[in-house]
């Protein structure tokens, strides 16, 4: 008999049988070697076949091992083994069966059938399992599906659905899928399309994270619960595993062969299976080689005829990029658009998922946390979609609490480290022998005993709190399990089990949980086991960099005292501070237009009067850090072509991938103060871009992504009209009119019209310079404090600085230079000369025409 008459799987099994015989020092390959190899073969069809007809695999394996041990062994094996007569007879019998069935190749299942012979030891072992030959013949007939074996690789394409798909209905039955809350319209629309006669293939299209896969999971759960029309009852929903389909397809045509096997098996199911392809766009071009068909083209005929019930899921961008280009594939699918759920719907979804996350993490999630997750994620995480981002917040906050429970509390850790430190000190002191050391040692011993007692008490509290938390988590797990068992009993119609679980098991467990919770009602000293809105805010803060206090602090009081807060840094300029404060309050109170930036201002005035400083103060007030200030120097955008730098270079130009200077900054920090410095120096075309930002609070970059400016404060500064401000000092009305004339002459009306407020800054008066001097000196004192030095200035020294540093034309900047020249420069020399050691107090006073330090 020729070896090439065997299928590739049987050839591999024969090779494994040879290795088995050599390993056991047997003189020849026996039928028992071959059956053992077939039973252990990866991806073989024999083991599933035996399990299907009722064989006990463990008992069979044990019987085969006994047979192997009973075979004779040779003393000095050469490693050269041949087929035994029994195995040759078995293969000839299989050959005869293959000829009867019209097969060109001998397959593994025919060898198994031939082995079921009462006259052989192997046959007796197989028949001893209580399975008849007739039952095995029927199972083999089902496996072959009435087809002849005309291809050596035919066994690899069998059970293609088991190999290359995941049964979602089975997972739903086992309770492994999360509950799907809401989404009734989308599920109903999907069912409606699936019920069509032809082109019954819905494709779910939506942004990433809106719940497309969840809709299919919801459909699987409805099929299991029988909550679908008769046409879909008892159907299986299988998810195609593209990774398994492509993995290991080394040769050309192997991928197509696998996909064809899947499609053939689906065809045999006669519409009893719905195929779900997640990331549908991956089918277009998958397996594509020169002259070969891709997966999308192989699916087309089955999709058009209605033979294949298929549900796809993909994002809007990928649908446009891959599927819309292939019009023939697109027309075979029916679009079902999946929108982002509202905040209220997200809260309902989170409430439905809450139990699953509580059981997984072993913590309790409050309703406040759920509401905070929906609201904060919607407000602060703008580049992702609900409900995904809200679920992620809950998950991460719960994970954080769980991590705290599992690791040693901070207080215990601190005591532990202190104890180790004291014990090291004790060992060092034991080597000394004088009186002072003995006293110190006795004191140390006292401290160690006291700390050890404190540590033991805390450890006991920690362990009892931990046990309480874990006990509660275990009971919750049992309740979840009982609910799944009740669902399974309901589907089977086992009313007795269902009643027992519903009215006995679950109430008992809930009572136990209540007792544990009642016992743990007192506030835990060391462990937090609840996820509250504070934990959610902490996670949002980690993601976005927006301080937690800003989300939860009573903003009302903070906003009412906004002017005082800003005046700590900005001296004078009451009109500007009030204008900015009012705009922020309008926005926070919800009275401002929600589709525009929180505020947009044009700051006008001479140099050095606090225009940029007010922006920095505003960024620090709103977001707790000056880092939230996005500063763009508009003098860099003087040429027409430089406009593209703000939103990114157009496609085809160098730098397209990098994105825009302004748009990328706001995408990364959507909550910020945007400062466009020296705006009058920019090219007029820049203002065309700004119109969209000021009117709609949005800007589209060169990649087509919309950047949200609604949470920003846009401030533009300009020196226009500063000469008129100096000339008309003291006359506010005339000043403003002159400046507005200059502004109207330079900017277009549609640009000025979109700005919330044009603020004119006044030149600084002498008394205001004194306040600024205090702020500047305060910063210097802070720097000196880092070197453990303090600085005190006499009134005369301060007056001298103000006199030297006051210049109405240049504002406060000359004061900074005066402090550098008269204070910082001489101080630096004295410190480097070693005159002032750390801890020294430095006083500055005027002697003659100089400021001296002592």
UniProtKB/Swiss-Prot annotation:
<feature type="region of interest" description="Linker">
    <location>
        <begin position="341"/>
        <end position="545"/>
    </location>
</feature>
<dbReference type="InterPro" id="IPR036628">
    <property type="entry name" value="Clp_N_dom_sf"/>
</dbReference>
<keyword id="KW-0067">ATP-binding</keyword>
<feature type="binding site">
    <location>
        <begin position="605"/>
        <end position="612"/>
    </location>
    <ligand>
        <name>ATP 2</name>
    </ligand>
</feature>
<feature type="binding site">
    <location>
        <begin position="206"/>
        <end position="213"/>
    </location>
    <ligand>
        <name>ATP 1</name>
    </ligand>
</feature>
<comment type="function">
    <text>Part of a stress-induced multi-chaperone system, it is involved in the recovery of the cell from heat-induced damage, in cooperation with DnaK, DnaJ and GrpE. Acts before DnaK, in the processing of protein aggregates. Protein binding stimulates the ATPase activity; ATP hydrolysis unfolds the denatured protein aggregates, which probably helps expose new hydrophobic binding sites on the surface of ClpB-bound aggregates, contributing to the solubilization and refolding of denatured protein aggregates by DnaK.</text>
</comment>
<feature type="coiled-coil region">
    <location>
        <begin position="391"/>
        <end position="524"/>
    </location>
</feature>
<keyword id="KW-0175">Coiled coil</keyword>
<comment type="similarity">
    <text>Belongs to the ClpA/ClpB family.</text>
</comment>
<keyword id="KW-0677">Repeat</keyword>
<dbReference type="InterPro" id="IPR028299">
    <property type="entry name" value="ClpA/B_CS2"/>
</dbReference>
<feature type="region of interest" description="Repeat 2">
    <location>
        <begin position="83"/>
        <end position="146"/>
    </location>
</feature>
<feature type="region of interest" description="Repeat 1">
    <location>
        <begin position="6"/>
        <end position="71"/>
    </location>
</feature>
<dbReference type="InterPro" id="IPR041546">
    <property type="entry name" value="ClpA/ClpB_AAA_lid"/>
</dbReference>
<dbReference type="InterPro" id="IPR027417">
    <property type="entry name" value="P-loop_NTPase"/>
</dbReference>
<dbReference type="InterPro" id="IPR017730">
    <property type="entry name" value="Chaperonin_ClpB"/>
</dbReference>
<dbReference type="InterPro" id="IPR050130">
    <property type="entry name" value="ClpA_ClpB"/>
</dbReference>
<feature type="region of interest" description="NBD2">
    <location>
        <begin position="555"/>
        <end position="763"/>
    </location>
</feature>
<dbReference type="Pfam" id="PF10431">
    <property type="entry name" value="ClpB_D2-small"/>
</dbReference>
<dbReference type="InterPro" id="IPR004176">
    <property type="entry name" value="Clp_R_dom"/>
</dbReference>
<dbReference type="Pfam" id="PF07724">
    <property type="entry name" value="AAA_2"/>
</dbReference>
<keyword id="KW-0143">Chaperone</keyword>
<dbReference type="InterPro" id="IPR018368">
    <property type="entry name" value="ClpA/B_CS1"/>
</dbReference>
<keyword id="KW-0547">Nucleotide-binding</keyword>
<dbReference type="GO" id="GO:0016887">
    <property type="term" value="F:ATP hydrolysis activity"/>
</dbReference>
<dbReference type="Pfam" id="PF00004">
    <property type="entry name" value="AAA"/>
</dbReference>
<dbReference type="InterPro" id="IPR003959">
    <property type="entry name" value="ATPase_AAA_core"/>
</dbReference>
<dbReference type="InterPro" id="IPR001270">
    <property type="entry name" value="ClpA/B"/>
</dbReference>
<feature type="region of interest" description="NBD1">
    <location>
        <begin position="159"/>
        <end position="340"/>
    </location>
</feature>
<keyword id="KW-0346">Stress response</keyword>
<keyword id="KW-0963">Cytoplasm</keyword>
<feature type="region of interest" description="C-terminal">
    <location>
        <begin position="764"/>
        <end position="854"/>
    </location>
</feature>
<feature type="domain" description="Clp R">
    <location>
        <begin position="3"/>
        <end position="146"/>
    </location>
</feature>
<comment type="subunit">
    <text>Homohexamer. The oligomerization is ATP-dependent.</text>
</comment>
<dbReference type="Pfam" id="PF17871">
    <property type="entry name" value="AAA_lid_9"/>
</dbReference>
<dbReference type="GO" id="GO:0005737">
    <property type="term" value="C:cytoplasm"/>
</dbReference>
<dbReference type="GO" id="GO:0042026">
    <property type="term" value="P:protein refolding"/>
</dbReference>
<protein>
    <recommendedName>
        <fullName>Chaperone protein ClpB</fullName>
    </recommendedName>
</protein>
<dbReference type="Pfam" id="PF02861">
    <property type="entry name" value="Clp_N"/>
</dbReference>
<dbReference type="GO" id="GO:0005524">
    <property type="term" value="F:ATP binding"/>
</dbReference>
<dbReference type="InterPro" id="IPR003593">
    <property type="entry name" value="AAA+_ATPase"/>
</dbReference>
<dbReference type="InterPro" id="IPR019489">
    <property type="entry name" value="Clp_ATPase_C"/>
</dbReference>
């Amino acid at each position: 008999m020729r070896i090439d008459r065997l299928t590739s799987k049987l050839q591999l099994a024969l090779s494994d049988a040879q290795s088995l015989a050599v390993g056991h020092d047997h003189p020849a390959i026996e039928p028992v070697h071959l059956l053992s190899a077939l039973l252990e073969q990866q991806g073989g069809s024999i083991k599933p076949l035996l399990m299907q007809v009722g064989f006990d695999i463990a008992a069979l394996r044990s019987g085969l091992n006994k047979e192997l041990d009973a075979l004779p062994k040779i003393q000095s094996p050469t490693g050269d083994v041949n087929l035994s007569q029994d195995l040759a007879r078995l293969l000839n019998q299989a050959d005869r069966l293959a000829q009867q069935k019209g097969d060109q190749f001998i397959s593994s299942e025919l060898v198994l059938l031939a082995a079921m012979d009462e006259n052989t030891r192997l046959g007796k072992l197989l028949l001893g399992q209580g399975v008849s030959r007739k039952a095995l013949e029927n199972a083999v007939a089902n496996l072959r599906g009435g087809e002849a074996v005309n291809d050596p690789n035919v066994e690899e394409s069998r059970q293609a659905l088991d190999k290359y798909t995941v049964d979602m209905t089975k997972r739903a039955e086992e309770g492994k899928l999360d509950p799907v809350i809401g989404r009734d319209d989308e599920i109903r629309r999907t069912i409606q399309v699936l019920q069509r006669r032809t082109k019954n293939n819905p494709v779910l299209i939506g942004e990433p994270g809106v719940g497309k896969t969840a809709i299919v999971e919801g459909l699987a759960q409805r099929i299991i619960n029988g909550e679908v029309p008769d046409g879909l009852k008892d159907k299986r929903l299988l998810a195609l595993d593209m990774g398994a389909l492509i993995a290991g397809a080394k040769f050309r045509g192997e991928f197509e062969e696998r996909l064809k096997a899947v499609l053939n098996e689906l065809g045999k199911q006669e519409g009893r299976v719905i195929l779900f392809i997640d990331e549908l766009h991956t089918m277009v071009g998958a397996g594509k080689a020169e002259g070969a068909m891709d997966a999308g083209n192989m699916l087309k005929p089955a999709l058009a005829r209605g033979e294949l019930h298929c549900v796809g899921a993909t994002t809007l961008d990928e649908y446009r990029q891959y599927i819309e280009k292939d019009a023939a594939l697109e027309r075979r699918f029916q679009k079902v658009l999946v929108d982002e759920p509202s905040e209220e719907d997200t809260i309902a979804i989170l409430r439905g998922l809450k139990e699953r996350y509580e059981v997984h993490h072993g913590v309790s999630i409050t309703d406040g946390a759920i509401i905070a997750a929906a609201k904060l994620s919607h407000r602060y995480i703008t580049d992702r979609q609900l409900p995904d981002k809200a679920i992620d917040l809950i998950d991460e906050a719960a994970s954080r609490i769980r991590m705290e429970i599992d690791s040693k509390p901070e207080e215990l850790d601190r005591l532990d480290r202190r104890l180790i430190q004291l014990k090291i000190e004790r060992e060092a002191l034991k080597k000394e022998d004088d009186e002072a050391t003995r006293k110190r040692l006795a004191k140390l011993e006292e401290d160690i005993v006291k700390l050890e007692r404190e540590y033991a008490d805390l450890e006991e509290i920690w362990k009892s709190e931990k046990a309480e938390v874990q006990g509660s988590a275990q009971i919750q797990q049992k309740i979840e399990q009982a609910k799944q068992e009740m669902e399974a009993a309901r589907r089977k119609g086992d009313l007795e089990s269902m009643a027992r679980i519903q009215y006995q098991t679950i109430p008992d467990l809930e009572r136990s949980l209540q007792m544990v919770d009642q016992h743990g009602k007192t506030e835990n000293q060391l462990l937090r086991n609840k996820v509250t809105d504070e934990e959610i805010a902490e996670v949002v803060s980690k993601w976005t960099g927006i301080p937690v206090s800003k989300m939860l602090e009573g903003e009302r009081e903070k906003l009412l005292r906004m002017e005082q807060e800003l005046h700590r840094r900005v001296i004078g300029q009451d009109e500007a501070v009030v204008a900015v404060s009012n705009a922020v309050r309008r926005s926070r109170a919800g009275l401002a237009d929600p589709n525009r930036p929180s505020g947009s201002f044009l700051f006008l005035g001479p140099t050095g009067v606090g225009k940029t400083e007010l922006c920095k103060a505003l960024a620090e007030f709103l977001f707790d850090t000056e880092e939230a200030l996005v500063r763009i120097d508009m003098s860099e955008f003087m040429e027409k072509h430089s406009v593209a730098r703000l939103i990114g270079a157009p496609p085809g130009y160098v730098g397209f991938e990098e994105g825009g200077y302004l748009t990328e900054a706001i995408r990364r920090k959507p909550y910020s103060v945007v400062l466009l410095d020296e705006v009058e120096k920019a090219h007029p075309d820049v203002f065309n871009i700004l119109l969209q930002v000021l009117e709609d609070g949005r800007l589209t970059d060169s990649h087509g992504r919309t950047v949200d400016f609604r949470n920003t404060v846009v401030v533009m500064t300009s020196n226009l009209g500063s000469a008129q401000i100096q000339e008309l000092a003291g006359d506010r009305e005339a000043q403003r009119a002159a400046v507005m004339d200059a502004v109207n002459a330079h900017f277009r009306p549609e640009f000025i019209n979109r700005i919330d407020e044009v603020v004119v800054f006044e030149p600084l008066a002498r008394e205001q310079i004194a306040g600024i001097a205090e702020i500047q000196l305060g910063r210097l004192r802070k720097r000196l404090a880092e070197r453990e030095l303090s600085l005190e200035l006499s009134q005369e020294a301060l007056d001298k600085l103000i006199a030297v540093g006051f210049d109405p034309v240049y504002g406060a900047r000359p004061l900074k230079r005066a402090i550098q020249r008269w204070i910082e420069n001489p101080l630096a020399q004295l410190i480097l000369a070693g005159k002032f050691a750390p801890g020294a107090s430095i006083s500055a006073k005027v002697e003659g025409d100089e400021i001296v330090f002592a």
